[in-house]
């Protein structure tokens, strides 16, 4: 629900601030006073209309799914429009793109303009027919849940089958690609850590000649061993330390002779090159081994494709048969309730001085999560596109009222532009009664030209223009009677108009 509206520099409005309560809110005033300017200014904060306002700020206390749009929700969410060179939109001081704001706004605001017919979507009609059945048959809820569960399983298997059919078209090529990778990796047969070990070995090999020459010279020390020991003994010094040192040196010398490196250097280099190829292609030996495992699995999958296809086709046909049977039950149930829905809708259309609508159920070949049914709506054999904008808005109103009546629920904000324009008093009163009923579920904003609708309002705002400046103020009871009388008789208010206004107000 909108609690507060604030705007600045909106054409004739230098500043406007409105405190709003729940129910029906109407804006009245002379032609050209700025009602539409104010109305569009409010809608512009939700990106549902264009406006010249520099600032619009609206407080909404509904729980909204702002997190889906990357906005943190608060108890009171503040929608703000700022216009300088460009128009910018904010919710709770967090920036939001125009299109995202539009999509969000449509989840809790219904704007009855001539541009959209989304009230008459097939899904909405089917949901109402199903709701009528639920009122009589409590088991129908679980039936619908089972149908949707079966349809989701059916869709998943259908997608898997389509994927297999696509694979079959290029399965031989995929097999060859998988075999080629398996053969390449398997022929190299890499081991984890092997590449690093071979690089160390290669480094040692590159120093082999220098090492052999150096140790060949160093071995001459062993020829002096006896001479040194004899000198130590004559000097009465224990020679064991020298013997131990030379023994350790002999071990090092033997190890450095690289007798273990006496193998094919070309083979070593080829091995390093093959392992290097795998590392370049797969980033690591570990990844190459993982790819080998994956490609073996894929090859097995391709070779078992026909078996998988048969199994899926069997499940697909079983589920399709099950869904067809349930869809028939759905169709029969909806046909049974179709006249009841049509009657409810036509009761509201009659109240709105419109001709009866006819609803027909068409059964489609293709099955969906809603079944196979499509509801066709006609007004006195005329298609929706042939209705005037006024008729279309009243039809929308009748449908929303029907929805609230059947579901005993409704939530959000309803904006009605020129809903009672060019109507008789009787027609305006009928619309007023429907809106009064809807205001139990929705917060409603409307521009009103006739006293019948305005008399039913919970909030009545008068828009006036003095010179070039427009102003808006909330009317008290006495001011409302005067404004209703003006709407009846014009600027020269008669006593009869005052009495009529009082009667409207009392009723």
Swiss-Prot record:
- Gene Ontology molecular functions: ATP binding; ATP hydrolysis activity
Q: Which residues form a coiled coil?
A: none
Task: Supply the InterPro entries for this chain.
Answer: DNA_recomb/repair_RecN, P-loop_NTPase, Rad50/SbcC_AAA
- Which amino acids does the record list as binding ATP? 29-36
GO CC list? bacterial nucleoid
Which superkingdom is the protein from?
Bacteria
Query: Which keywords does this chain's UniProt record carry?
Result: ATP-binding, DNA damage, DNA repair, Nucleotide-binding
User: Example GO biological process term?
Assistant: SOS response
Q: In which family does this protein belong, per the annotation?
A: Belongs to the RecN family.
Instruction: Outline what the protein does.
Output: May be involved in recombinational repair of damaged DNA.
In Swiss-Prot or TrEMBL terms, this protein is called: DNA repair protein RecN
Q: Which organism is it from?
A: Campylobacter jejuni subsp. jejuni serotype O:2 (strain ATCC 700819 / NCTC 11168)
């Amino acid at each position: 629900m909108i609690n507060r509206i604030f705007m600045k520099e909106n054409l004739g409005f230098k500043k406007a601030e409105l405190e709003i309560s729940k129910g029906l809110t109407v804006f009245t005033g002379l032609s050209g006073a700025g009602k539409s300017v104010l109305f569009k200014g409010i809608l512009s904060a939700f990106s549902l209309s264009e406006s010249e306002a520099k600032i619009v700020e609206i407080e909404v206390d509904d729980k909204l799914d702002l997190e889906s749009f990357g906005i943190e929700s608060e108890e009171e969410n503040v929608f703000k429009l700022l216009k300088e060179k460009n128009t910018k939109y904010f919710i709770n001081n967090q920036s939001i793109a125009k299109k995202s704001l539009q999509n969000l706004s449509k989840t809790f605001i219904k704007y009855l303009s001539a541009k959209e017919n989304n009230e008459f979507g097939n899904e909405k009609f089917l949901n109402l027919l199903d709701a009528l059945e639920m009122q009589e048959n409590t088991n129908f809820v679980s039936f619908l849940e089972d149908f949707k569960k079966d349809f989701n399983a059916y869709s998943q298997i259908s997608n898997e089958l389509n994927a297999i059919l696509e694979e079959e078209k290029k399965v031989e090529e995929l097999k060859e690609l998988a075999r080629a990778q398996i053969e390449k990796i398997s022929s190299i047969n890499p081991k984890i850590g092997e590449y690093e070990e071979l690089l160390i070995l290669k480094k040692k090999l590159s120093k082999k000649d220098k090492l052999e020459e150096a140790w060949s010279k160093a071995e001459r020390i062993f020829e002096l061993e006896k001479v040194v020991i004899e000198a130590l003994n004559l000097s009465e010094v224990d020679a064991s330390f020298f013997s131990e040192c030379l023994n350790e040196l002999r071990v090092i010398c033997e190890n450095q002779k690289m007798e273990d490196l006496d193998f094919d250097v070309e083979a070593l280099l080829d091995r390093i090159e093959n392992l290097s190829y795998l590392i370049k292609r797969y980033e690591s030996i570990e990844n190459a081994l993982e790819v080998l495992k994956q490609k073996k699995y894929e090859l097995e999958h391709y070779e078992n494709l026909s078996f998988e296809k048969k199994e899926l086709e069997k499940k697909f046909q079983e589920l399709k048969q099950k869904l067809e049977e349930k869809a028939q039950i759905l169709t029969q149930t909806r046909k049974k309730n179709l006249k009841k829905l049509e009657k409810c809708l036509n009761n509201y259309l009659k109240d709105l001085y419109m001709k009866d609508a006819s609803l027909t159920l068409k059964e489609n070949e293709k099955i969906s999560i809603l079944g196979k049914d499509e509801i066709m709506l006609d007004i006195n054999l005329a298609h929706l596109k042939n209705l005037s904008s006024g008729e279309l808005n009243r039809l929308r109103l009748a449908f929303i009222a029907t929805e609230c009546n059947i579901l005993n629920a409704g939530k959000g904000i309803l904006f009605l532009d020129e809903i009672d324009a060019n109507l008789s008093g009787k027609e305006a009163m009928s619309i007023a009664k429907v809106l009064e009923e809807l205001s139990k579920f929705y917060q409603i904003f409307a521009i009103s030209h006739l006293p019948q609708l305005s008399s039913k309002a919970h909030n009545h705002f008068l828009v006036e223009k003095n010179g070039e400046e427009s102003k808006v103020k909330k009317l008290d009871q006495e001011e409302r009677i005067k404004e209703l009388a003006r709407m009846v008789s014009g600027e020269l208010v008669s006593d009869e108009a005052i009495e009529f206004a009082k009667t409207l107000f009392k009723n």
